[in-house]
């Protein structure tokens, strides 16, 4: 994302939504416990 982008959050949420849509369970697990556990 660029600093000139007004609302990067909406863009990110839109992307997540699309991806997530494929496998929301996996995305949720990775976003919540995956990052805190792996990293």
Swiss-Prot record:
Instruction: Tell me the tissue specificity.
Output: Expressed mainly in the posterior salivary glands and, to a lesser extent, in the anterior salivary glands and secreted into the proboscis (at protein level).
Q: Which UniProt keywords apply?
A: Fibrinolytic toxin, Hemostasis impairing toxin, Hydrolase, Metalloprotease, Platelet aggregation inhibiting toxin, Protease, Secreted, Toxin
For the keyword 4Fe-4S, the answer is: no
What S-S linkages are listed for this chain? none
Q: Name one process (GO BP) from the record.
A: proteolysis
Is the Electron transport keyword given for this protein? no
Under Gene Ontology molecular function, one entry of this record is: metallopeptidase activity
Q: What EC designation does it have?
A: 3.4.24.-
- pH-activity dependence text: Optimum pH is 7.5. Active from pH 5.5 to 11.
Gene Ontology cellular component list: extracellular region
Q: Its function? A: Metalloprotease with anticoagulant activity. Cleaves fibrinogen Aalpha (FGA), gamma (FGG) and Bbeta (FGB) chains after positions 'Asn-121', 'Lys-160' and 'Pro-102', respectively. Breaks down cross-linked and non-cross-linked fibrin clots. Prevents and reverts platelet aggregation induced by ADP and collagen. Prevents thrombin-induced platelet clotting. Does not affect plasma levels of coagulation factors prothrombin (F2), V (F5), VII (F7), VIII (F8), IX (F9), X (F10), XI (F11), XII (F12), plasma kallikrein (KLKB1) and kininogen-1 (KNG1).
Q: What else is known?
A: Presumably not injected into the host's bloodstream, as feeding by H.ghilianii does not cause prolonged bleeding of resulting wounds.
In its UniProt entry, what is this protein called?
Hementin
């Amino acid at each position: 994302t660029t600093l000139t982008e007004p609302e990067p959050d909406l863009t990110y949420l839109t992307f997540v939504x699309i991806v997530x849509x494929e496998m929301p369970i996996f995305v949720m697990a990775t976003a919540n416990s995956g990052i805190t556990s792996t990293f």
